[in-house]
Amino acid sequence: STLLASSAASDVYKRQVSDETDNKAGAECNTRMMLTGQVFAVMSGTATEEQIQAICRSADAYLYDRKAGGYRLNTDFKEEKFDLGRMFGFAYGEKENGAVFSHMAVMYANALYKTGHAKEGYKVLQTLLDTAMDFERSKMYPGIPEYFDNQGRGLYAYLTGAASWYMLTMITEVFGVKGQLGDMVIAPALMPEQYDHCLLYTSPS
């Protein structure tokens, strides 16, 4: 019965991947990587420390594109596959097909900070900020767009929840102010270069 259940689950997975139950995601030898799977593996605590380090190295090697604005959602699969959701209906670098998708990028940063990888998390957040604030390139008001395209242009700022995740990460992970079992914990994870840009306000006693 276990074998049957496993087989049935596999068939369901394949149907979700492809309407034709033809799972070819890893059929070719070309390197293919998607950020989403890495993020949830780290954020859920499933990935080991060794695996997290490998994820960071691979993401830097295959997904990071400074010109585009940071970490792309996936590598270029170089195919049109219209039975795999809407992802491959877009040209590479647009929306879900390989754009720098701000929401997932910020969640990646959050996951890295939570697991003690502040340097790597800082790189994610800072690249997004630098791209958004480069108005000649981003061509948008200050803020976080849904995604940056191949040229680093910010698009659809009203469609994303990335800003709330960015603020959450800055407050609870970068500045390290969070609650824990009824206590307030302050455990900042600031990089040395951030100290010159931080101010501490205290109320008069």
Predicted feature locations:
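Single conserved hydrophobic/aromatic residue that forms the stacking wall/gate
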Residues: 2-9, 13, 201-205
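N-terminal alpha-helical segment
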Residues: 5, 101-105
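Extended glycan-interaction surfaces of carbohydrate-active proteins
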Residues: 10-100, 126-129, 133-148
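A general alpha-helix detector
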Residues: 37-38, 104-108
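Non-catalytic C-terminal accessory modules of carbohydrate-active enzymes
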Residues: 61-66, 78, 89-97, 107-203
